[in-house]
Swiss-Prot record:
Family stated for the protein in its record: Belongs to the RNase H family.
Protein name as it appears in the record: Ribonuclease H
UniProt key word Metal-binding: yes
UniProt organism field: Bradyrhizobium sp. (strain ORS 278)
A Pfam family reported for this protein in Swiss-Prot or TrEMBL: RNase_H
Catalysed reactions listed for this entry: Endonucleolytic cleavage to 5'-phosphomonoester
EC number(s) recorded for this UniProt protein: 3.1.26.4
Binding sites annotated in the UniProt record for Mg(2+) 2: 12, 136
GO CC entries: cytoplasm
NCBIfam families for the chain: PRK00203.1 (NF001236)
Protein localization: Cytoplasm
Subunit text: Monomer.
Named cofactor requirement(s): Mg(2+)
Length: 154
């Protein structure tokens, strides 16, 4: 079996108001090739946009990959590496039997990572990490797009 191609993904989400217009951005890097993705929604939350950044990046991959995914969202990293296992066992309920917030996005993220081997990395936001800063700018572009129209993606 050949080794999986290694792809680095850098994601970020942003929201103007919480809830409010929001955007997400992602950078996918394979060797010396890069692809930028961004999108937004007119009425959303910062956590939903953080999830959409990771989902959209993973869904853009056309074959199984070894993914190094970098996010400044503890919500996404802790959710996907820890909390999700209990949620699935509990029928998408929290430990105190309440419905999981953003369950449909967590389920979509769970499905999007199935074909891949993923290492999740947390980076401190707004701390000068070049790719995180670029993903943040893409997310802010997504907010601007969302203010102008309905749900958008490019």
């Amino acid at each position: 079996m050949s080794e999986l191609p290694v792809v680095s993904i850098f994601t970020d989400g942003a929201c103007s108001g919480n809830p409010g217009p929001g955007g997400w951005g992602a950078i996918l890097r394979f060797g010396d090739k890069e692809k930028e993705l961004k999108g937004g929604e007119p009425h959303t939350t910062n956590n939903r946009m953080e999830l959409m950044a990771a989902i959209s990046a993973l869904e853009a991959l056309k074959k199984s990959c070894q993914v190094e995914l970098y996010t400044d969202s503890q919500y996404v990293r802790q959710g996907i590496t820890g909390w999700i296992h209990g949620w699935k066992r509990n029928g998408w309920k929290t430990a105190d039997k309440k419905p999981v917030k953003n369950a449909e996005l967590w389920q979509r993220l769970d499905a999007a990572l199935k074909p891949h081997k993923i290492n999740w990395h947390w980076v401190k936001g707004h701390a000068g990490h070049p790719e995180n800063e670029r993903a943040d700018q893409l997310a802010r572009d997504g907010v601007a797009m969302a203010r102008m129209q309905k749900n958008v993606r490019s």
